[in-house]
Regions:
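Cell-wall polysaccharide-cleaving catalytic domain and substrate-binding groove, primarily
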Residues: 1-143
C-alpha cells in the first residue's frame, strides 16, 4: 500500500534504487526505464512470464503487480490444480494445459479476492475495469 505509481509502491521503488546505489525519492518521479526494469525483475521474472503460455503470462503478471507475486502465483497454482507454494516452476507451467480456461478462472479468482477487500466499495469499480481489460487482452493474446 501507500504511495504507488504504475502499480509500483514506494517500498519497491526505494529498494530498487537502493540496490543501484541511488537515493530514495518519491515514486511519482519514477522513469519509464525504471518502470520497465522493476516490472521485469520484480514481477515478470518472478512469475516465470517467459515460460507461461501467451496470455496467461500477462494475466499472472498484471495480478502480481497489483496484488503481489505470491498471491498471483498461488492463485494460478490453485486454478491449474498443483500445490500452492507460491513459486511457479516446471509443474505449474506444465499444468497450464488450457490457456483460455486458465485466464478466465484466474481473472474470476482475482475478482473474488478483490471483492473481499474492505476497500472494494471505494476502489472496486476501477479494479473491476482493470481485471476486465486484462482478461480481454489476455484472451486476445491467447487466441
Amino acid at each position: 500500500g501507500g504511495e504507488t505509481n504504475k502499480g509500483i509502491t514506494r517500498a519497491v521503488y526505494d529498494s530498487y534504487r537502493k540496490m543501484r546505489g541511488r537515493p530514495s525519492q518519491s515514486v511519482k518521479f519514477i522513469s519509464e526505464e525504471e518502470v520497465r526494469a522493476i516490472y521485469k525483475f520484480q514481477y515478470w521474472d518472478r512469475v516465470q512470464g517467459d515460460l507461461l503460455p501467451t496470455g496467461v503470462d500477462y494475466a499472472v503478471f498484471d495480478f502480481a503487480v497489483n496484488s503481489g507475486v505470491g498471491r498471483a502465483s498461488k492463485y494460478l497454482q490453485a486454478v491449474v490444480g498443483v500445490a500452492q507454494d507460491g513459486i511457479i516452476g516446471a509443474r505449474t507451467v506444465a499444468a497450464v494445459t488450457n490457456p483460455i480456461a486458465t485466464i478466465n478462472a484466474l481473472c474470476d479468482r482475482r475478482m473474488g479476492f478483490l471483492r473481499n477487500l474492505r476497500t472494494f466499495l471505494t476502489f472496486g469499480r476501477g479494479w473491476a475495469r482493470r481485471v476486465q481489460g486484462v482478461r480481454a487482452h489476455a484472451l486476445e493474446m491467447a487466441t
